[in-house]
Amino acid sequence: MTDDADSTVESNNQGEESGSAADKIAAETVLITGCSSGIGRTTALAFRQNDWTVYATARDESDLEKLAEAGCKTAELDVTDDDSVERVVDRIIEEQGGIDCLVNNAGYAQMGPIEDVPVEDVHRQFDVNVYGPHRLTRAVLPHMRAAEDGTIINVSSVSGRLSFPGGGVYSGSKFALEALSEALRGEVDAFGIDVVLVEPGPVVTNFQDRVEDEVGGLPRSEAYEDIYEIMDDYHAIGGAGPFASEPKDVARVILNAASCTEPGPRYPVGPVAKYGVLARFVPTPMRDAVIGIARRLLG
């Protein structure tokens, strides 16, 4: 497989706020969404190689055959469908008696200038990136509360900290996911449940293919041609750029967060994510000026 993850848990030095170094002793059960490729697939392998019982899910179960061969349990799961979510969670509870960790990884990026993105596309973006994790979280929380233990890991993005022209819809969905996670952390802490945000920068996956598909379906107004030219450049999006992380880098952070007795609340992954976090503290006029210069240079 091209995205094999490291077979051992390494000390995490990538987090903005690191958790306790102590690892949980017993192998546990994890439910991971969006495992057809990239981060999700690599994360499922990393958990399995560390003796977790892994339920790897995707919209099309046929995309999970290699994970099944590796020892993962697989299931078809559409994060936008309540019945699909309940069916998978009920199966895990019946087979394992509980869910120790939920990794909300499924997602995609709807790029494009705000004016050009139809409302129905915005709704679809939020249905997958925000309402999907919300559905899964609501489904697993009663069981985690009963066990007085559990970890919910939401895979966000540096775009959940910093928005940019052409990325407002995607960033909006990730900003929302971060807000939900912040609130949830305070709500469930008393029940022994941890809520963690993992915030990758660009990652070498097929994520860019979906970006191009979504942008290709937009009306593409001439008024924003410079933004489209930037988005047409694969390296400008970042998926194959020199600062992109590998899926195994993200998988390692997710596994470490799930294995910690006291994980940190946030883990940026990769140089772009770390600098993106710092960019939030740059005065808005200065940040806008830099974006304007970048548009002129790259557009």
Regions found by a protein language model. Give the residues of each.
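A glycine-rich helix->loop->beta "capping" turn
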Residues: 91-104, 110
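Conserved glycine-rich cofactor-binding loop
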Residues: 36-37
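Substrate-binding pocket helix/loop in short-chain dehydrogenase/reductase
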Residues: 113-114, 121-123
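Conserved amphipathic alpha-helix within the SDR
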Residues: 73-76, 83-97
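C-terminal beta-strand-loop-alpha-helix "lid" module of Rossmann-like NAD(P)-dependent dehydrogenases
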Residues: 189-241
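Active-site helix of classical SDR
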Residues: 137, 173-176
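Residue(s) in the substrate-gating loop at a strand-loop-helix junction
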Residues: 157
